[in-house]
């Protein structure tokens, strides 16, 4: 099977969302023909890695977790030409904007199933993903709740299927109004990496409490620091991760100094390969995150045999209870949280070891091998159902691109949509027989309102690219 995956994050960036996108592509490439389309320093196809995965890079700028792609006419044409040549059976995007939107247009024109994994709760999209990592107040402010809802509604309507990570995500998508096909397929992990972790020695006087993730308001480390005030001094809180926004780590450090806490260790971001060794030394993994669709680090903690104490959220509700740690309500006080941590750390060795074993069993089915099988089955079902592009779909696509600013990008997309509507056979074969030197036809339709934010996509990407490049990005 030939699959084109799309992510807004380079390898090693974007937190759990970026990590799972690249890991999924790498795992797929072991048995399938796969390309990952993602930000890069230059636009073009890069050599494959040891698994056979190829990277098609889209020129982007930015030195943080998120890089802004420069969706110029040249870039869009290069991406379309590559997809025409690769001719994937399925296009699978992890984000509903920018590169993902361009990939969706190509898939619809070519009658190729388009799948989107929803890593966010649609009603709270601005609190997740790329916007969480952007340090660009102007762009963040432009993404109002109303606009983001319209974007998602229209993007979802052009998907052949959505993937929900769990039942809470499925419920959220249905509540949002999506009535199309949804597959429930969880995030995968390489469980073998954590299977060898030894359980922490519960008899040790010093107890290590670990949290792994970005330092951010959503992750709610403030609450963990407040809980630390109610724990003995030999309970050490280790915060592994970097701040998403400048000054946030310093804010947390000031809070520690105000409370006189010397037992909070800001360990910073560490290579993901070192996470198992940190979990192995942890007596409890703690989480006060306000929202987590399906947290990779909670899965990894459980896979390592580390009990979890957490405040209620989508992931904690799904995976954590008294058999593997403790789940508290959102309204629980920091003192109550601390009491639960101390209770777990005070268990007799045999009871603590039982928690550790239960934790491993809780996530035993979340290995990548199982996730890949579920995903392949979903793809095959979609391929069987996929019909040729209809006139209605073609009209919808024209409405989509008509909202783009006048210029070469809009003309390219309009031309190719119209050609796909006229030719019932393979678009790739059809394009090979047509002269691409013909001047692109002018747009004939009045701008529609179907995709309110689509027009801003190209503008925002180019403006954002220039802003980020102006911060000191190297030139080619």
Predicted stretch roles:
Residues 168, 188:
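Carbohydrate-associated surface elements
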Residues 212, 236-253, 268:
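Glycosyltransferase donor-sugar binding loop
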Residues 4, 201-230, 238:
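Conserved donor-binding/catalytic core segment of Leloir-type glycosyltransferases
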Residues 290:
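Aromatic "clamp/platform" in nucleotide-sugar-dependent glycosyltransferases that forms part
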Residues 307-310:
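Short hydrophobic beta-strand element within catalytic cores of glycosyltransferases
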């Amino acid at each position: 099977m030939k699959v084109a995956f799309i992510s807004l994050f380079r390898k090693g960036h974007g937190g759990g969302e970026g990590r799972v996108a690249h890991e999924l592509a790498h795992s797929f490439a072991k048995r399938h023909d796969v390309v990952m389309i993602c930000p890069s320093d230059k636009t073009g196809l890069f050599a494959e890695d040891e698994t056979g995965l190829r990277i098609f890079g889209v020129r982007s700028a930015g030195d943080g977790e998120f890089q802004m792609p420069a969706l110029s006419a040249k870039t869009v044409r290069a991406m379309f030409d590559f997809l025409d040549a690769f001719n994937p059976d399925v296009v699978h995007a992890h984000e509903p904007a920018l590169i993902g939107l361009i990939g969706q247009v190509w898939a619809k024109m070519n009658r190729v199933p388009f799948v989107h994994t929803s890593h966010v709760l649609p009603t709270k999209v601005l609190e997740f993903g790329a916007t969480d990592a952007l340090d660009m107040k102007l762009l963040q402010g432009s993404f109002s709740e109303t606009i983001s809802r319209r974007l998602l509604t229209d993007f979802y309507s052009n998907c052949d299927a959505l993937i929900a990570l769990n039942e809470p995500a499925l419920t959220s998508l249905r509540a949002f109004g999506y009535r199309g096909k949804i597959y429930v397929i969880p995030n995968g992990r390489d469980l073998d990496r954590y299977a060898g972790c030894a359980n922490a020695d519960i008899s040790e006087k010093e107890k290590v409490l670990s949290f792994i993730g970005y330092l951010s308001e959503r992750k709610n480390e403030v609450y963990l620091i407040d809980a630390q005030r109610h724990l003995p001094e030999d309970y050490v809180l280790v915060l592994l991760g970097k701040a998403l926004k400048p000054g946030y780590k310093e804010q947390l450090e000031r809070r520690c100094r105000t409370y006189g806490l010397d037992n909070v260790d800001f360990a910073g971001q560490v290579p993901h390969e070192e996470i198992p060794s940190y979990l192995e030394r942890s007596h409890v993994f703690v989480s006060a995150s306000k929202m987590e669709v399906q947290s990779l680090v909670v899965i990894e903690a459980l896979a390592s045999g580390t009990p979890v104490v957490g405040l209620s959220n989508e992931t904690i509700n799904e995976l954590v209870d008294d058999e593997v740690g403790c789940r508290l309500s959102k309204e629980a006080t920091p003192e109550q949280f601390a009491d639960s941590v101390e209770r777990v750390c005070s268990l007799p060795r045999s009871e603590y070891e039982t928690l550790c074993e239960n934790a491993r069993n809780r996530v035993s089915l979340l290995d990548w091998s199982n996730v890949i099988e579920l995903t392949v089955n979903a793809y095959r079902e979609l391929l069987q159902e996929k019909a040729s592009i209809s006139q209605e779909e073609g009209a919808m696509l024209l409405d989509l691109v008509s909202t783009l600013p006048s210029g070469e990008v809009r003309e390219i997309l309009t031309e190719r949509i119209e050609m796909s509507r006229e030719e019932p056979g393979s678009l790739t074969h059809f394009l090979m027989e047509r002269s691409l030197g013909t001047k692109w036809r002018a747009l004939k339709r009045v701008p529609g309102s179907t995709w309110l934010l689509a027009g801003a996509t190209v503008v925002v990407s180019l403006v954002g690219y220039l802003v980020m490049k102006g911060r000191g990005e190297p030139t080619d």
